[in-house]
C-alpha cells in the first residue's frame, strides 16, 4: 500500500519563498519601500534625540540657576559662581569637539551639506556623542547658540547610522537618509514640520537630489520626528506671542522698508561672522588648551550676562515674546541688539557646538520691534502694532543671511501661529533676500562650507607632501 507523498516544499524553501515575496513587495513599482521604512526609523530616532537634547539643556540650565540661588546672599560669590558654572560647561563642550570630532564644532549644517556632496566624511560614531553632549554643555551654559544646529547634524548622522546598521547600499539611499535626518532634526528643534521640509529643498537645494523617493522619505522622516516631539511637548506653538492684528494693505510698503534694512544688515552680519572666525583662530592658533580656555571665557561671559542682563544671553526663545509684546524701551532694544550681535559672533564663530538660527531669529525680532516702535510713532493714523514688525523681522535676517526666505517665513509662522501675517512676512523676506543678493552677499552656510573644504584640501596637500618627503629620505 502506497503512503502519501510528503510535501516537496521544505520549511527552508518556504522561508526563502516568503523572503522573495517580501522583497518583491518592497521593490514594487520600482519604489524601494525599504528606504521609506528606514526614513520612518530615522525620523523616530531623530525626534527622540531632539527631545532628549532639549530636556537635557533645560535641566542643565535649571541646575545652573539653582546653584545661583544658593549664593544669592553673597553678590561677589554669586557673580563668581555664575561665571564658573557656565565656563566649566562650555569648556566641556569645546574639549569634546576639539579632542574627538572637530567636524562637530559650529552649526553642523555645512557639514551635512558637504556630506551630501560627498566632500565631507560622516563619522556618526564620533559625531553623535560629541555633538549631543558637547551641545548640552554649551547651550546648558547659557551661550548664545541655537538647538537646531546640533539636531540637524545629529539627524543627518543618525540617517547615516541607520544606513550602515541595515547595510543599505547605493548613493540614493545614503543621500536620501542623510537629507531625511537633517530635515527631521530641524522639524523637531522648532516643532515646525513644513519648515523642516522646505529647509532641505531650499537651503540645501544645490546638494539635495530631488526625486520622488527622496521627497517621500523626507516627508515621512519629518512626520515621525514631529510626532515624537509633540508626544513629549504637546501640540502648542513653540513661541507664544498671542494673536496679532493683520497688516492693512496701505501699510505693506513699511514692511518692504524693513526688508531693505535686513537686506543691508544680513551680508554685513555674515562678514562679521567670518571675520570673527579669523580673529578667534588667531587667538588660539589651533592649540587645544588655548581654544578650550578661550571657550571657557566666552561661556563664562555669557553666564555673567545671563545673571546681569538675561535678555542678552541664551538662544533667545525667552526674549522673543517679551520683545514682541513691547515690554522694552527703545534704548533697551538697542542695547539688547548690540549685545546679542557681539555675543552671537563670539559664541558661533568660536566653533562651539551650537546653531545660529535661534540667535538670528532673536536679533530679527529685536530689530523688527525697534523699527515697529518708530513707525508707530511716525504714522499714528495707521493704528499699527510694533509686534507685527517683530514677527516679520524674525525670519528676515535668516532670509538675508542664509538666503532661505521660504524657510524663514514658514518657520516663523509655525513657531508663532500667526498665519495672518504671511503677506507682510513675504514682502519683508523678499526685500531682504533681493537686496542681499544685489549687494553681492553670499549665503553664510555656503561660505563656511567653502572655508572648511579649503582647509581640508590644504591639510591633505600638507600630508601628501610630508609623506613624499619621508619617502625620499
From Swiss-Prot:
A motif (Selectivity filter part_1) lies at residues 106-110. A motif (Selectivity filter part_3) lies at residues 355-359. Residues 109-116, 177-189, 193-201, 387-401, 402-404, 405-416, 417-421 dip into the membrane without crossing it. The keyword DNA-binding does not apply. SUPFAM superfamilies: Clc chloride channel (SSF81340). PANTHER family: CHLORIDE CHANNEL PROTEIN. Proton-coupled chloride transporter. Functions as antiport system and exchanges two chloride ions for 1 proton. Probably acts as an electrical shunt for an outwardly-directed proton pump that is linked to amino acid decarboxylation, as part of the extreme acid resistance (XAR) response. Homodimer. This is H(+)/Cl(-) exchange transporter ClcA. It comes from Shigella boydii serotype 4 (strain Sb227). The lineage of its organism: Bacteria, Pseudomonadati, Pseudomonadota, Gammaproteobacteria, Enterobacterales.
